[in-house]
């Protein structure tokens, strides 16, 4: 069948896209796009990576932590794919819900979307085991106690906050826990990639580069 979208083009099998559970999970992603950020973009392969990682992490001790949950695309797909509300785990979704923290010299590319915190609360008020936490990272991590992590998504579009989160959370990640770095291999994100490479080299880990631009690390 082949696939050409979201920075990749491949003739590899896309059979996973026909899976009924995956279709339902991706439908949840589209429902979450209330501000139109995703629009007509096709991120199915990226979501495939997310739900694969979540499925692995389901059987590892620890909670799910989403640093830069944005509009809730990853979270909503995971909730549907794993029936997360039935699990003995908590999903922590952190975001400013208004874009990048300009203290680090970043341009806020999400400024035109305003503050979407209430949108996320309203869209996901029926989900069990979900904690939606508003604030800039890594500072906001100090407001909660998380003992063990099996799944960590890092998508802050900014070097310093991402490395700050990893410094705080690394020791809490269980053996075999999965880390997804959303921007790792994307064009224009070399500063993030280089910083992540340095961090994970210090932990004797190698980041796997996905054709989607995501990076994957297993602790």
Identify the meaning behind each predicted range.
Residues 45-49:
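N-terminal pre-P-loop "Q-motif" helix
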């Amino acid at each position: 069948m082949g696939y050409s979208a979201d920075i990749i083009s491949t003739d590899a099998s896309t059979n996973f896209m026909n899976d009924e559970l995956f279709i339902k999970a991706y439908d949840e992603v589209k429902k979450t796009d209330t501000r139109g950020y995703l629009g007509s973009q096709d991120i199915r392969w990226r979501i495939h990576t997310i739900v694969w990682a979540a499925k692995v992490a389901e059987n590892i001790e620890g909670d799910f932590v989403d640093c830069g949950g944005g509009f809730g695309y990853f979270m909503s797909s995971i909730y549907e794919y794993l029936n997360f509300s039935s699990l003995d785990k908590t999903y922590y979704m952190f975001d400013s819900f208004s874009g990048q923290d300009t203290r680090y010299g970043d341009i806020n590319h999400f400024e035109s979307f305003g503050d979407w915190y209430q949108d996320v609360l309203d869209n996901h008020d029926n989900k069990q085991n979900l904690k939606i936490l508003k604030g800039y990272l890594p500072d906001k991590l100090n407001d909660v106690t998380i003992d063990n992590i099996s799944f960590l998504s890092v998508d802050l579009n900014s070097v310093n906050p991402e490395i700050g989160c990893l410094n705080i959370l690394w020791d809490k990640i269980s053996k075999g826990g999965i880390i997804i770095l959303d921007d790792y291999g994307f064009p224009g994100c070399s500063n993030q990639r280089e910083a992540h490479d340095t961090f994970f080299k210090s932990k004797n880990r190698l980041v796997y580069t996905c054709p989607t631009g995501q990076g994957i690390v297993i602790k």
